[in-house]
């Protein structure tokens, strides 16, 4: 009778049909049975003639109780282990991205991002003072503001967010405040592309703008010139050179429609921010290419360009020199309109226009 009653209570305990109070009382009873079993085992060791044992139902109850306590111990240990391991892994991430000072993984990545944007996006650069990075478990998130210069004014145009997992970089999420900025199209026309060499459309656009404005214009030349020659050709114009498109491949029809690669011009406010050593803009461009080649996979993801081939371009520039086939200039609208009549300018595209800030 007692065994039947105990079995019924055990089934209720096993199926979770007891109240909390009943379950607590039953577990206390199981503890007593466990002690009782130990006592009997001890006596049996001294007297093998005893034939005492606990019923199968009670044995099952004791086993179930033991399993439950074991699961609880394992769960507690798992939680404690997790709470100990997570901070250690996060600390490891901080050390991975931060150790090495200037040459740490985190700093190298942020510098690569700044250089890549400067070389692949005409007149758009990273505002390094507003750069934000956050180290997380096994990774790092970096967000950098993008700026451009129009006239003498520097304006924010958007931001780019990049996630790293260890040394791998995910495709960036780019947010432009003005969608027009994101319309890359053809910034420049390569000298080899004779069919698109015209300034008519740009001249018409500039002629409709009032005198109290400053413009950003993408100029393309009849051929590639050394940087100094470009500046000398246009030294009589009241304009600023913000970015120069550099010829980094052999002059062929195939290169006519490729995206440009270049460097901030002599009047760009962002030139000093790159902090590259060199006696001239040409030296600085070569040094920037060398730095970018160290992390070309990062640069490809950040620029969203698989055609970088930095080592080949670097080899071409070192053999043939730094020659400019196009420039981004800014200045008074009417002054740039006059500049388009220079015989060295073969095509032009109008970019952003702002109210007078010259």
From Swiss-Prot:
Q: Which GO terms describe its cellular component?
A: membrane
Q: Which residue ranges traverse the bilayer?
A: 74-96
Location in the cell: Membrane
Q: Which domain of life is it from?
A: Bacteria
Q: What induces it?
A: Cotranscribed with sigma-M and yhdK. YhdL and yhdK negatively regulate sigma-M.
Q: Which InterPro entries match?
A: Sigma_reg_C_dom, Sigma_reg_N
Q: Which UniProt keywords apply?
A: Membrane, Repressor, Transcription, Transcription regulation, Transmembrane, Transmembrane helix
Tell me the membrane topology, using the record's own terms.
Answer: Single-pass membrane protein
Spell out the subunit comment. The N-terminus of YhdL interacts with sigma-M. YhdL interacts specifically with YhdK.
Give the protein's recorded name: Probable anti-sigma-M factor YhdL
